[in-house]
Amino acid sequence: MSRFAAPHAAIVGALIMAAGAAMPAHGQSAAGAIAAPQPNAASLPLIPLPARIERKPGSFTVGNGTAVAARGAGAVAAARLLTARVSTTRGITLVPGPSGPIRLVRDSSIKGEEAYRLTVSPDGIRIAAADDAGLVHGAMTLAQLLSPDDAFGQAVAVPALVIDDAPRFRWRGYLADVARHFQSIDTLKKTIDQMAALKLNMLHLHLSDDQGWRVEIRKYPDLTRIGAWRVPPTAGGPAPAQPYGGFYTQAELKELVAYAAERAITIVPEIDLPGHAQAIVAAYPELGVFGDRPAVSGNWGVNPYLLDPGPKGIAFVKDVLDELLAIFPGRYIHLGGDEAVKDQWQRSPRVQALMKAQGIASENALQSALIREFDAYLRARGRRLIGWDEILEGGGLPQSATVMSWQGEKGAIEASREGHDVVLSPAPILYLDNLQSWLPDEPPMRPANPPMTLERVYGYDPMPAAIAPQDQAHVLGAQMNAWSEYLTSPEIVWHATFPRLAAFAEGVWSPKPVRDFRSFLDRLEPQVKRWRRDAIPAADSAFAVGYQLDGTRSAAVASGQARLILANQAVHGTIRYTLDGSAPSPASPLYAGPLTVPLGRTVRATTFGTDGAPLAAPRAFDTSVAALLRTDSVTLSACSGGIELRLPLTPDATAFGPAFNSNIFDGCLAWRGAPLSVAKAYRVDVGRLARNFGLAHAFTRLKTYYPATTFGELVVRGGGCDGPPIGTFPLPDPATAPNRLRFTGNLPAGTTDGDLCMTFTAPLSGPLYAVEQVSLEPSR
């Protein structure tokens, strides 16, 4: 899917952003029938918070050599997971044995799918469940109780208690987009481990898209020989010599399915169709509409290639399904259905004749006919079709089809009203490729206004108020999606995913009455330490210190001092700072209010948790005149609105920077309120990026500037975006020039503070230009 974000607000607006049970319905579990926990339950280091916790007197100490007893394959597997998890997060070695003080048992008296009871007494610990999934969840809860702090390797006194727990929703999902940017099996296993720790149970693998086909299909070997590889787009000069891609063998995926199943996770494969099919058509042109062979796409967004809706295309999909069903034993098969622009079908005499012969009135109805065909094929084999909410648009959706609602919640509301099961996955709130803060060190992602912060994700309720009570039984749950156009490496994927996935996990597991964001933040502190033990580079964006200059930059330069307001997004922990650029410690001064700092100092600040450990890496604010007269791309905005993206220098860059705020529809960017009155000259650092965007019908919104030279110009205006140019710089030949450029010019005498606007007039058929940094030279 391609999701373009709206224009962002000023960075400072985001820095301080805080910040009687019924029987379970069809989509919900027994958790709704379990009483709320006692108030002191929130002090336990547990995410997600269990449905019910009863504290008891006493405790039981677990240390090296404590024995774990389990009988039956499921209990033994859960005990093995417990032992491995505790070894990693606490450094304690538990020992399996025929008997022991920690016991995992099957108990049919525990009611509800995935439910468990965890009992801690001075005599030992017992985990009981009626199914294997419940045993895994109980083991993960105990593992968290055994890692409450940073005392690695030390024994733990677990407080006596009884936990009765079960999930709020049956579908607690996470999507890994391995089509845009490939992820190794080892990376997926690491993600699965984290999902299990958070009691998520559905891993949605997006295995095909315009940019790549990722699963071995033996009947169609060119899907991976050709369709799994794309040539990275160029920003000028020769194309990269090495193609980008990869795929999974059937054996690898079967092994991954087993690995996930042991952790109570079902893998849901997605083959996207009839749109997002360019990799298929690149491999087998006869499966397209016109018979031409495109390249596997290097463009993000919406591309025109559709699957043939006739007998050839239908037979192909059924062949693929036959092989997928042998790999993935889960109930659901996802067949996409999103963003299929119908131009190719509309312009094909053959397709139009097919529609006429079958009495199909519209292209949307033709897509619905395909969905009905594949739904019947899957039902006959004991499976169920699930698709994105566009599968509703043509009408006649089979009752058995499940709808995943991404275009807000409207698809879920409509589908549940019509009697379909639904999964909530609305953009942008559950889209992890949206920025979680406006901190300048965030990697390239989709800007959101406001950012998709930890608190916003935590506050999302997967049961929309607009779904009528009689339809709520159709809500299976919800899913977060990590679309990977800009999530180019495991480190960036995990930065985007954690800790927001933990906030989401509590929303789909814990009963609504027990949830509280402040309590969640307290419980997140030990979870941050677990991620560090697991080598998961979770984002610290919610706790990182952001800076707001109180007043204008020009006023600070003129006065020789800066007044700074410090805050973190979550409004959590304590902020300590230094004024000499050194890293803050728990002994550093406590931030209690705005700081007035003589220019030339570097303020460095960190948020510390309740135990005195840092919750985020230090962030700095340089108060030198040079820094005050400089801005990075993150603070630039579109001159006249429009869609923005935060782009990497090259499409497949795996590092965290640089990042370029870009308006892909209008080549004009503005530094709002630039301190021009205290400057005499400017320098603009420019990056030349690949223009790799599939815009479909949105191409009509592209704004064209007439170039006065062969490759266009950078035009700088200092009196607002409609003012006269103060500098015009011809752009060099992209075929031979480097992809980072620098331009300098003088400001007219008497220039006052205002917007500094930079417009690129380069042809839309060539690369995309973006501003990396703007620097002003002080006038004195």
Where are these regions (language model features)?
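Extracytoplasmic
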Residues: 618-780
